[in-house]
Amino acid sequence: MIIEKAKSYGFCFGVKRAVEIAEESQNAVTLGPLIHNPLEIERLAKNYNVKYVETIEDIDENVKRVIVRTHGIPKDKLQNLKEKNVEIIDATCPFVKKPQEIVEEMSKQGYDIVIFGDKNHPEIQGVMSYSVHNRVYVVLDPKELEGIRLKEHIATVAQTTRKINDYLKITNYLIQNYKEVRVFNTICNATFENQDAVRELAKKADIMIIIGGKNSSNTKQLYNIAKEFCEAYLVESEEELKKEWFEGKKHCGISAGASTPEWLVEKIISRIKELA
């Protein structure tokens, strides 16, 4: 069986930067998981004593340094963190900071804000918090906008890990129904590249293995694209692989989410070779 990796996959710039920051910040804690990959979080805790807490209240008084996760945190939480006697190390991805800045600036100019994304995702919770008013609407589908009467001046941004075609559905609806719509394409280039690469590979493979955290938005997007073209599975570790998946298969494609380290990809490929 041929095992082929997608042309573009795995650690993106923002995640690589955050992991390097964590490795250089031994004994620090992160506010929320640094990235959406439990095995990499486990490695950082084991090798560098960089652990995470869920809330500011959970930060022990002995902690000297706190790392802000790649997804960013809400503005009020950042302010609360500044009031504590700790050094703040900001590992927010620069591509995530961009929609934060846009939302802050456009809301100051009086624009209603439409955000394409998952309102429960930490990145979006952070982006929302930068609006200076409460006319902020987070949607995943244009139908969610039908019952809302927006002002005539609208600015829109997208979660960095979403599919561009889904964002276009939102922007097309807004342009058809409102006079002024400022569209900011805040979807990350790495997301585009990984999605294009998985689509290309899935078209010629008869099975795709997508590696990454089950709670990772960008990994789920890769899995959803892959399964449009062939049998596909999303796994976090080699223990989840099953021998029967590979029976009769001739071409196995591999891709991985932006928070998936290369050591994990190689570990899973080794296990596939044993099973196939």
UniProtKB/Swiss-Prot annotation:
Dimethylallyl diphosphate binds at H36, H71, H121, S216, S217, N218, S259. (2E)-4-hydroxy-3-methylbut-2-enyl diphosphate binds at H36, H71, H121, T160, S216, S217, N218, S259. [4Fe-4S] cluster binds at C12, C93, C188. Gene3D superfamilies: 3.40.50.11270, 4-hydroxy-3-methylbut-2-enyl diphosphate reductase, catalytic domain. GO terms for biological process: dimethylallyl diphosphate biosynthetic process; isopentenyl diphosphate biosynthetic process, methylerythritol 4-phosphate pathway; terpenoid biosynthetic process. The active site is at E123 (proton donor). InterPro entries: LytB/IspH. One of its GO terms (molecular function) is 4-hydroxy-3-methylbut-2-enyl diphosphate reductase activity. Binds 1 [4Fe-4S] cluster per subunit. It catalyses: isopentenyl diphosphate + 2 oxidized [2Fe-2S]-[ferredoxin] + H2O = (2E)-4-hydroxy-3-methylbut-2-enyl diphosphate + 2 reduced [2Fe-2S]-[ferredoxin] + 2 H(+); dimethylallyl diphosphate + 2 oxidized [2Fe-2S]-[ferredoxin] + H2O = (2E)-4-hydroxy-3-methylbut-2-enyl diphosphate + 2 reduced [2Fe-2S]-[ferredoxin] + 2 H(+). Belongs to the IspH family. Catalyzes the conversion of 1-hydroxy-2-methyl-2-(E)-butenyl 4-diphosphate (HMBPP) into a mixture of isopentenyl diphosphate (IPP) and dimethylallyl diphosphate (DMAPP). Acts in the terminal step of the DOXP/MEP pathway for isoprenoid precursor biosynthesis. This is 4-hydroxy-3-methylbut-2-enyl diphosphate reductase. The gene is ispH.
